[in-house]
Amino acid sequence: MAGHLVNYGKHRTRRSYARIKEVLELPNLIEIQSNSYQWFLDEGLREMFDDIMPIDDFAGNLSLEFVDYQLLEPKYTVEEARQHDANYSAPLHVTLKLTNHETGEIKSQDVFFGDFPLMTDQGTFIINGAERVIVSQLVRSPGVYFNSAIDKNSRTTYGTTVIPNRGAWLEFETDAKDIAYVRIDRTRKIPMSVLVRALGYGSDQEIIDILGDNDSLMLTLEKDIHKNTDDSRTEEALKDVYERLRPGEPKTADSSRSLLFARFFDAKRYDLASVGRYKINKKLSLKTRLLGQTLAETLADPDTGEVIAAKDTVVDRQVMDALAPYLDCEDFKAVTYQPSDEGVLPEPMTLQVIKVYSQKTPDKEINLIGNGHIDAKVKHVIPADIIASMNYFFNLQEGLGSTDDIDHLGNRRIRSVGELLQNQFRIGLSRMERVVRERMSIQDTSTVTPQQLINIRPVVASIKEFFGSSQLSQFMDQTNPLGELTHKRRLSALGPGGLTRDRAGYEVRDVHYTHYGRMCPIETPEGPNIGLINSLASYAVVNRYGFIETPYRRVSWDTHDVTDKIDYLTADEEDNYVIAQANSPLNDDGSFVDNTVLARYKDDNIETSIDKLDYMDVSPKQVVAVATACIPFLENDDSNRALMGANMQRQAVPLVNPHAPLVGTGMEYKAAHDSGIALLAQHAGTVEYVDAKVIRVRREDSSLDTYELMKFRRSNAGKNYNQRPIVAKGDHVDVDEIIADGPAMEKGELALGQNPLIAFMTWNMYNYEDAIVLSERLVKEDLYTSIHIEEYESEARDTKLGPEEITREIPNVGEDSLKDLDEFGIVRVGAEVKDGDILVGKVTPKGVTELSAEERLLHAIFGEKAREVRDTSLKVPHGGGGIIQDVKIFTREAGDELSPGVNMMVRVYITQKRKIQVGDKMAGRHGNKGTVSIVVPEEDMPYTPDGTPVDILLSPMGVPSRMNIGQVLELHLGMAARNLGIHVATPVFDGAQDKDLWDAVREANMPSDGKSILYDGRTGEPFDTRVSVGVMYYMKLAHMVDDKLHARSIGPYSLVTQQPLGGKAQFGGQRFGEMEVWALEAYGAAYTLQEILTYKSDDVVGRVKTYEAIVKGEPIPKPGVPESFRVLVKELQSLGLDMKVLDIDNQEIELRDMDDDDDDVVNVDALSKYAKEQEEKKAQQEAEKAQAASAEDPSAE
C-alpha cells in the first residue's frame, strides 16, 4: 500500500500520498493581520506622536510634548458590540507635558484621544456592529529607481527617479544630445549641474572632481553657462531652481535655499520612511555595486597596508567577502567635500569612492560613488544620496549597474493594517497640530493646560473615516471559513496611493517570477480586477519593511547537502541565489540523489549541478495560496479552471450536515483551525461538561475555563454560523486544540460540501451545457440543505407630526393578519411568515389639514383625537418568508444607545431552510461548475451493478476542452477511498501519482479501468458503454435561485421617464430592449408591442385609465403618448429647437406638462365625488359634536 497515515487534529486520520518530508510548519495564516496591528499598538502609535510632537507656538514660548499613551479596557465585549451596533474599541489616553519657556512652569495632563477600534482575535474589526477586514495594500516601495528606454533614434536612454513615501519626486534624464537634466516634483527640467551648484559646489572643476569625468556631464557643463556675473555660480543656480519651482515669483537666493531645504531636507515635509532609507542605502552602497566589476585601483587595509584586492581584480563573491568588513567602515575610501556657505546645507558631504573600469571601454577608469554610511534614522534625502544616484545614473551609460523592474516584488511592498492606520492617524494628528498652534497664540499662556489646547475631533474623524469608508476597509466576506481566511490574506493593488482599475496595464496584472512563494499565481478574481487583487502564498510572511519573504532550506556550501536551517528571503535577495525545487530527490541524510537537479535562478528554470545550489524550496505548496492548496490534483488542472476552483470554494454555502472531502490535500485542517471560526482551547485541561451551548474545561491548575458556543448567528453574508462540540466529557484537550466545529467544518476539518456518487454520462439532454442532473436522494436526505438567516429592522422615530408608535392597533388590517403579533404588535418567535406578512406593527401620524379658528377652539375644549394615522408596518419582503428565529427590542429606557430621533428599534431574524432545487449553482474544486437542471426520482437514476443509484450526473463534454483532468483523477481515487472506508490526502504538486491511484483502485477491488456498467433506472437495461463512476467533492454555491427569482406586475416607476425601475432590489420590471422590439415587429404582433411600449411602461394616463377600465369591466381605451417621448421633446426644446408633434391630419398635438394640470391622470369626477363625500361627513360630525355638547351643558342654550 502506497501512502502513510497522518493525523490531522485528534479526530481525523488520512492516508497521505506526500513524498516530501514537511520540514517547516505553516505559519499562522492570519498573522499578516494580527502582527501588523500589534506592531501599531506597540510601536506605530508612539512613532506617530514622536513625529508630530513637540509642538511649539509661533513665538517659541510654549511647547507641548508627548510623554506616554495607554489603551484602557474596551467598553463592550466583541459580542456586545455586535448586538448594540457599536464599535469594538478602547479609549486611548495620552499623557502630555506643556512647558512654558518664559516662566519655566511645566504642566502634565492625561488627555482623552477618542475611542480606538481594536482587532478581534480573528483579525477583524467590529465597526457599527458589522465585522470588517482591512485588506493589505501592494504599493511601489519608496527608494531610487533606474529605468531605460529606447528613443526614436534607437539609442538607449536612462532615467532615474527618487520616490519618497511623501514629498517631492526627484528625476534625472538625458535628452537626444546627451545632456543630463533634473526635474523636481514633475516641474520643468533644469541641467543637472545646476542642482549640484545649488548644493554649494559652484565651480565646474568641483563638479568634475565629485562626479568624475563623464561625456554626458561634460556636455551638461558646456550647456550650463554663467549668465549673470553679478551672482556667484551657486546663487545663480539657486535662482534658476526657484524660477522653475515658483515661476513668476521674485527670485532670491535666500528664498530658494529655504524652498529647497523644505522640499528635500526637512524631515516634516519629506519622508522616505525606514523602508525608503533601507532601499536607497542598499541600491547605492558599493557592496552591491562592486560585484562583477574590475578594480582600477588596489584596495589595501588602511591600518596595516595589507592588500585586500589588487588592481585589475574582478570582484566575485569571495573577493566581496574579504572586502565587505572594510566597506562597512566609515572611513574606508571615504572622500569629504565642503560646500560653500551659499549652498542649501552647510554640512560637509562624505562619499565612498572606488575606481573601476568601464564595461563599454575597458581601459577607461570610472568612479563608483556610494552614499557613505547614512544612519537608518535619517528619513529624508541628503546631498550624498543625490550625488551617489547621479553617479549611478552616469555609470549606467558605461554599462555599470542595472535598471529596475517596477513589477519585481523587491520593489513592491505591502502596507498592512498597522501602517494604513498609522498613515490615517498621522493625517488626523497633523490637522490637530494646526489647531494646537493657533490655540497656543490665542490662549493666556499662564493658565493654559494641555487639555485646553488639544482638539481631538480631527483625529477621531480621520480614524472613523478610514474604518467607515476607505476602499481598503471592507465588509468581511463571511460565506464560509475559507472565504473569511482568504479575505484576511488578500493583497490589493487598488486603493488610495495605489493603482486604479482603468489605468493598470497588462504588466502590473501579469504573473511575475518573483511571485514564486510570495503571491499565488492562480487565485485572483476574473473580470476587471484580475491580477490587481492577489492572495498571499501559504508560507509567505511579511518582514518589518513590508516586503514579502518566503522560506528556503539552506544547502551547505561544503557538503552540498540540504540542511534543516531555514532562511526567509525577499525577492531581491533571492535574485542572488540558485534554488532547487522542493521535489528534487533526496537521500535520508539530506544529500541529493542526482548530481544535476532542476533549479531556478532569477526568471530562468535551469538544470544545474548540485555544487552551484544555495537553497532548496521548503514545500511544493509554498507557491500557492490556501484556497488553491485545497484543490487535489491541482497539477492536472488548467490554470484558468484552477482559478475558478479556488474562487468558488469561497462561495460554498455552509450545509446543515457537511462532510469533509474523502480526497483532501491535508490543508483542510490548517485552514479551518486558523480561520477563527472553530472554537479553540485556550489552555490544556480535561473536559468537565459539554452541551450544545457550553463547554467547560478544568485546567491543570484546577481553575475552570468556560467556552460559550456560537448558536445560529447570522453571518455578514446571511448564512447560518453555528458551532458544534466535537469533544466529550473526560477528554483531555491541549492548548489550541479544536473543541468545537464551526460552520462548514467536520471533525476539525474544512467541509464545504458533500461526497456524492457521481457519473460522467449524458442523460436525456438534461446535462447539456454544464447542467447538472441530481438525484432526489440529495433533497430527501438534506445533503445539500442550508440555513439562511435574514435580518429586518423597524425604527419608531419622532416625526414633525408626533412620534411613531409600535402597536397592534393598525388601521384597515384584519384580525387574521395580526394573529402572530403579540400585544405590542411585534411578531412572536417561532411563527411561520410568508411574503407580505406583518413583522412589526407601526403607525405614523398623518399630516393634518390647516384647521379653522372654530375647529381649533373645539379641539382645545374637547381635546379630542381626530388625528389620523397611517400604516407603516414592517412587512416581509418578496421571497423573504420563513420561521421567526429571534426578535430583539432596543429602547432608550433599557439603556440602549439609539440614533437621535429614534425611540425604539425592533430587529427581527427570519430563518429559511433551503433545500437544493432546480436553478441552484453547484461546483467541484476544479472549476467544474453548473446549475441544477432537473431533480430525478431516486428510482429513475442510473444505478451500479450492486444496485446503488448514482447521485449526480455530469456531462462528459465538460472535461476535454476545459482541461481540468484533476476531477477525473479525484473521481477514481474518491471511489477507492469510499470502498476502503478511508480519507486520503493528496497534497498539491506532491500527491498521488498514476501508479498510486491505480494501486488504490486495485486495493479497493474496483475494475481496473475505474469504470462501471450502469443500468437505466427507468428500464433496467444496461447502457451501451462503461461509465466513469466515482466520488467527487461537490459544493452548493451562494448563487441560489431563491435569491434571483423575481416577478412584478406593478411597482415603482422612475421619476423622470416614468418607466418601471430595473432589478430585483428595486422590485423592477424586465427590460424590453431595442432588439426585443425588432422581434415583435418582425413577427407582426402590433397590439402586443403597443401595450408593452405604452400601458406596461410609461404612458402615465393610459395606465391609470386601463386600471379603471379593468375594475369597471369596460373596454380598454386607446393608449396616450409615452412619457419618455415627452421627455425627448423637452430635451430638444431645451436645445432651442422648436419641435411640434403633428397627428395624421397635420394637426398639432398638445403635449401637456406633468405638473401643469394633472386632471387626466386622476379621474376628475371621482375626485369631486370624493370631496363632496368628505364635506358631508365633516358636517355630520360637527352636528353630532354640537348635539353632544348641548346635552352635557344645558346652560349653553
UniProtKB/Swiss-Prot annotation:
Cited InterPro entries: DNA-dir_RNA_pol_bsu_ext_1_sf, DNA-dir_RNA_pol_bsu_external_1, DNA-dir_RNA_pol_su2, DNA-dir_RNAP_su2_dom, DNA-dir_RNAP_su2_hyb_sf, RNA_pol_bsu_bac, RNA_pol_bsu_CS, RNA_pol_bsu_protrusion
Record has Transferase as a keyword:
yes
The record's listing under Pfam families reads:
RNA_pol_Rpb2_1, RNA_pol_Rpb2_2, RNA_pol_Rpb2_3, RNA_pol_Rpb2_45, RNA_pol_Rpb2_6, RNA_pol_Rpb2_7
Q: What class of enzyme is it?
A: transferase
UniProt keyword terms in alphabetical order: DNA-directed RNA polymerase, Nucleotidyltransferase, Transcription, Transferase
Q: Which Gene3D superfamilies match?
A: 2.40.50.100, 2.40.50.150, 3.90.1100.10, DNA-directed RNA polymerase, beta subunit, external 1 domain, DNA-directed RNA polymerase, subunit 2, domain 6, RNA polymerase alpha subunit dimerisation domain, RNA polymerase Rpb2, domain 2
Q: What is this protein called?
A: DNA-directed RNA polymerase subunit beta
Q: Which organism is it from?
A: Latilactobacillus sakei subsp. sakei (strain 23K) (Lactobacillus sakei subsp. sakei)
